[in-house]
A protein has these predicted regions:
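Flexible, solvent-exposed loop/hinge segments and secondary-structure transition points
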Residues: 5-153
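Classical Sec-dependent N-terminal signal peptides that target proteins to the secretory pathway
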Residues: 1-2
Length: 153
């Protein structure tokens, strides 16, 4: 959708709203319960890294609050899964990545658990970050969240 006002085109872009974020967080929590991994913190941000939703499960690690938010921000900001950022920093075999300096970025998280959220056509909507379980389980939870809204992306 485009509108023209005084010769200037206004572009309409899809956004993550609170209702979509709640569906995603619910799906992540359902995956955590089904798979019985540690409780998690869930952060969902838009493309400007503004927090749309944050949810902390009972007994999720307090230090993971900040990590979940930073995973979401990292994945929205670059925008790739934080697992890819880990590979860029440390390499797939952990012998050194092609961009090791990323590790020194203050708010960047370079391990799995953050995923970008995109429309089917590839438009970036934001990202989800999950922290509290293992990195692989965090990523599994984030993937379950995105899968829950695939039909409307």
């Amino acid at each position: 959708f485009s509108a023209v006002a005084d010769g200037h085109a206004l572009k309409s872009v899809p956004v993550i709203n609170l209702e979509m974020a709640k569906v995603m967080a619910d799906a992540c929590e359902a995956d955590q319960k089904k798979s019985s991994y540690n409780p998690v913190n869930i952060a969902i941000v838009d493309t400007g890294n503004d927090l749309v939703l944050f949810r902390r499960q009972n007994d999720a690690y307090l230090l993971s609050i900040d990590i979940a938010i930073k995973k979401a921000n990292s994945s929205a900001g670059i925008p790739v899964p934080t697992r890819v950022i880990e590979e860029l920093v440390y390499g797939k075999d952990k012998s050194g990545g092609v961009i090791p300096g990323l590790a020194f970025s203050k708010d960047l998280v370079a391990f799995a658990g953050g995923l970008p959220i995109r429309t089917k056509s590839g438009v970036l909507l934001g990202a989800i970050g999950v922290s509290g379980a293992s990195a692989d389980e965090d990523e599994q939870c984030a993937a379950a969240a995105i899968s829950a809204v695939e039909d409307i992306l």
